Amino acid sequence: MMASLMLNGAQNPKLINGIAPHGLGSAGLNIHNKCFFRKGVRRNMTLTCSISASRPASQPRFIQHKKEAFWFYRFLSIVYDHVINPGHWTEDMRDEALEPADLYDRNMRVLDVGGGTGFTTLGIVKHVDAKNVTILDQSPHQLAKAKQKKPLKECKIIEGDAEDLPFPTDYADRYVSAGSIEYWPDPQRGIKEAYRVLKIGGKACVIGPVYPTFWLSRFFADAWMLFPKEEEYIEWFKKAGFKDIKLKRIGPKWYRGVRRHGLIMGCSVTGVKPLSGDSPLKLGPKVEDVKKPVNPFVFLSRFILGAIAATYFVLVPIYMWFKDKIVPKGMSI
């Protein structure tokens, strides 16, 4: 039921082994392509997508501001595994999203960046020994939840910044980051770091949301956190120096591939590091100012808006779950 889109160098996208999502695809490309479905039916499809609202790293959205987001992370750690994941990041989605990462060797050294409560790490340690996995996150409250999970007891768990990783160059065999990029003030810097810490031939796998098409969802998304376009993911990987870049669409089964109604759908993007050393991309100093005092009135208003947005995005999948139960299979929802 999950639609898969593989993009090689952001060209020639094809939907494979899945259903065609409605209303989303590669923004700005206006691509017409042949799609092959499980039942052998071939159809023409036009891929279109909304454009995410650009914003400089110096003006982060609410949850992208590390200092303001501290309390959000603290609350999120309480409800993440039991409230957020069932609607937006299920075990089936996790396992399918990790498949392109090629976790085929239990002795691989794997970094789970933005690992939070360790939900994604639980999928990683199915294929790699826990002692070879490092979980990094900036939230001590999220990491405290990860430490409580028995399968992760042997993982190395550290606090850190995805945009300034505390690992040497050419360090890891695999870099995984799931549900984290939407919180980064400067995604390009984070993906550049992914390139740096990987060994030659190593693979990065970044899993995150895709910019919604519904106007109300776009409003909340632009105020709350980063929801990249599909081709933005590809562009960040290309600029960082990755090769063999591929993108795979993911989403809860009960969405039936639909990308309207304000739904958050996601993608898993992978790329291979072709050369040892740092990324060829040169960036200036970080512009995020975490030392600047927080205006309490601005913080309160942004916090309230963020809480409303969070509630909205929790309710939408519940609505779709009920709709999936009511509408007969095979019919559009």
Predicted segments, located by residue:
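N-terminal chloroplast transit peptides
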Residues: 1-39
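Conserved alpha-helix/loop element of class I SAM-dependent methyltransferases that forms part
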Residues: 87-109, 123
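Class I SAM-dependent methyltransferase SAM/SAH-binding core
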Residues: 109-165
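A short acidic, Gly/Pro-enriched loop at the edge of an enzyme's catalytic core
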Residues: 163-175
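A short SAM/SAH-binding and catalytic strip from SAM-dependent methyltransferases
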Residues: 173-186
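A short glycine-rich, Lys/Arg-flanked "PGG" loop and its adjoining helix->strand segment in the class I
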Residues: 188-203
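Conserved class I S-adenosyl-L-methionine
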Residues: 203-232
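Core SAM-dependent methyltransferase catalytic element
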Residues: 253-299, 320-333
